[in-house]
């Protein structure tokens, strides 16, 4: 076969296969171009899920008539000169418009701010026509019709019109969160019109824009994040652990304003929530990373969806540390969705007939967010808490003992035969975040009263979290006990993996794992954590080597130890069906208030829900 040059049309179609995956990819490229042009108003119109029509209109700086032909030519751009490592624009390759034009019927109209009239060019299957004059307001209009008509095989891979329209909406929302000063609107024959009004600049404006996308409920269950380390800043908002979702569609990440779906960022997010939500649940988060463009490579993915950090360990550590700190400082806080679900259940049974229709979860107004109550009694913190109860001095349950020795010192476990009774709630206890215990129902749920709400606590789930946190603190307070192997286990590894693992020997020793290099391509394991019992040493070492190679951390072993602690806590905590005295119930409530993360159990389930008095009154038609 003869080697020959490909035609420009074929080259662009190949590029389109990388850049233009579906109609939403076209919208992403066109909206990013509009943002780079300084637009403050962007309108998107679609038809047929974007396969029939895509139109993006903006009021940006526009393109001069003599540059329109260049704009649809391959590798022509105004955003990049000679430094590919200092990229400050969303687009920079000069591939999008020619790639789109090679597989569709594209019309580009533009009028710069200082021009008397507009001009347009048309590209049909890669063939250019124009420029020629056209009537146009200042700004740019890009219209794409019959997407993939020139490559019909691609159409077979398209989803339904509704699915493609939904993907377009998701793209616009993701971009819109990072640019609250821009007004976005979507319309068309294949969708319900959607609009995001401009909210301005700054943190308050970003909050309002997030509310437009995620709804009022997120604002009521979000924690602010703001941290910086070695020139990398992390800002944004994350949901409390009990406010989670069944998929990761409500996770948004941005690097220097660019929306990305980087597995490293979302992996760090998952790691931060590893012991506070269930494995099959996902946190809700909006994260903004800001750093020197020279410290991140955005030119590693055709659609610029992934990035590569110069120091990935720094970024991961910043994300995990900042989120864990925010979760720890948030105190106890239930998700509003739990109480709402209970109220809905009452309404479904016919309660509260006079109740007005509840506000939809996704309804939003800036005023409602600003006036929404923050975390209940946010002035409270574990440091200022002073338990007003009789301390329980019982020993840890048998399940918390290992080899006859207590793994955890004293754990407050109420007596098995205690009987509950309704007592008059002291006023000072009702002022506490979780109030005063009034009763125990079904020998599993503690009913407490605050000044303005009713609190229902799952005693087993709550005590499970308390024991788990105490176990973790014990693990971190002193080195983990190890057990010597009669015969050291030799694990063969690639030489570079063995060297990296040996470099973390001191850290691993704190967790009871004794390793040392055994020749150029092997690791000798002489000691393993006693808590883990019998284990597959070979698999553990290989997993740790992979983790260190990817993240430069050895968190996997710590995660395993935490998992064992969680299992021990589950078996060693107060069981359902156990009767508690009022003072023991109050002791549990006070311990919850003093323990970060006590709003969820080790499996991610809520430990309590709170019903406001106003909601209860509505159920009975009093409001």
From Swiss-Prot:
Residues 353-389 are annotated as: Disordered. Keywords: DNA damage, DNA repair. Residues 353-368 have a biased composition (Polar residues). GO terms for biological process: mismatch repair. Pfam families: DNA_mis_repair (PF01119), HATPase_c_3 (PF13589), MutL_C (PF08676). Signal peptide: none annotated. GO terms for cellular component: mismatch repair complex. One of its GO terms (molecular function) is ATP hydrolysis activity. NCBIfam families: mutl, PRK00095.2-4. This protein is involved in the repair of mismatches in DNA. It is required for dam-dependent methyl-directed DNA mismatch repair. May act as a 'molecular matchmaker', a protein that promotes the formation of a stable complex between two or more DNA-binding proteins in an ATP-dependent manner without itself being part of a final effector complex. Belongs to the DNA mismatch repair MutL/HexB family. This is DNA mismatch repair protein MutL. The gene is mutL.
